[in-house]
From Swiss-Prot:
NCBIfam families: pimt, PRK00312.1. Catalyzes the methyl esterification of L-isoaspartyl residues in peptides and proteins that result from spontaneous decomposition of normal L-aspartyl and L-asparaginyl residues. It plays a role in the repair and/or degradation of damaged proteins. It comes from the Archaea. It catalyses: [protein]-L-isoaspartate + S-adenosyl-L-methionine = [protein]-L-isoaspartate alpha-methyl ester + S-adenosyl-L-homocysteine. PANTHER family: PROTEIN-L-ISOASPARTATE O-METHYLTRANSFERASE (PTHR11579), PROTEIN-L-ISOASPARTATE(D-ASPARTATE) O-METHYLTRANSFERASE (PTHR11579:SF0). This is Protein-L-isoaspartate O-methyltransferase. It comes from Pyrobaculum calidifontis (strain DSM 21063 / JCM 11548 / VA1). The gene is pcm.
Length: 207
């Protein structure tokens, strides 16, 4: 099932690198969905979790992962843990060499994600925190990459500050016409942002 989905994403040009391809093959998406959706785990669509959250569609996880150009040794911040699937894919994409810090505002989701990641052996590479991800995680900054999995009204200043020079942020932002996924590169203390595609994410919560 995973192999067929990944082959399709490679064919469509969503997956471009061996690292992301291997990561998508290794992480069992069915372990990160609620029981009633296990049979749909390898459909290329978002699925409901609980507390108003969703697990992103596989093509979106792959696309966002490709945009940060993963490599061993990276330190990644994820804002919006959900069930932990995206963090696990990032961990595999950096070959479990480095660190993924992920912040979830909903307590029940943070617990659910931590349980999933622990069961599958990711704790140690992935650390789950409960809190307002818009504020980042200053104690572990700077980050090589920041991934935001919910739509922000604007790019949070704290996340830019916690991005290292040359680092990349991938973030969906609410625009007048809808949501746009941006690749943001920090250079010379300033940010350059490039629109990637229109997207549809749940809103980034405040807390």
């Amino acid at each position: 099932m995973a192999a067929r989905l990944v082959a399709e994403l490679v064919k469509e040009g969503v997956i471009k690198s061996e690292r992301v391809k291997n990561a998508m093959l290794k992480v069992p998406r069915e372990e990160f969905v609620t029981p009633e959706y296990r049979m749909m785990a390898y459909e290329d669509r978002p699925l409901p979790l609980f507390a108003g959250a969703t697990i992103s569609a596989p093509h979106m996880v792959a696309m966002m992962c490709e945009l940060i150009e993963p490599r061993p040794g990276m330190k990644i911040l994820e804002v919006g843990t959900g069930s932990g699937y995206h963090a696990a894919v990032c961990a595999e994409a950096i070959e479990r060499q480095g660190k993924v810090y992920t912040v979830e505002i909903v307590r029940e989701l943070a617990i659910f994600a931590a349980q999933n990641l622990e069961r599958l052996g990711y704790l140690g590479v992935v650390e789950v925190y409960r809190g307002d991800g818009r504020r980042g995680l200053e104690r572990h900054a700077p980050f090589d990459a920041v991934l935001v999995t919910a739509a922000a009204s604007e790019i949070p200043k704290a996340l830019v500050e916690q991005l290292r020079e040359g680092g990349v942020m991938v973030i969906p932002v609410e625009e007048g016409v809808g949501q746009v996924l941006y690749k943001v590169v920090k250079s010379g203390g300033k940010v350059k942002r490039q629109a990637v595609t229109y997207v549809l994410f749940v809103p980034l919560r405040e807390g």
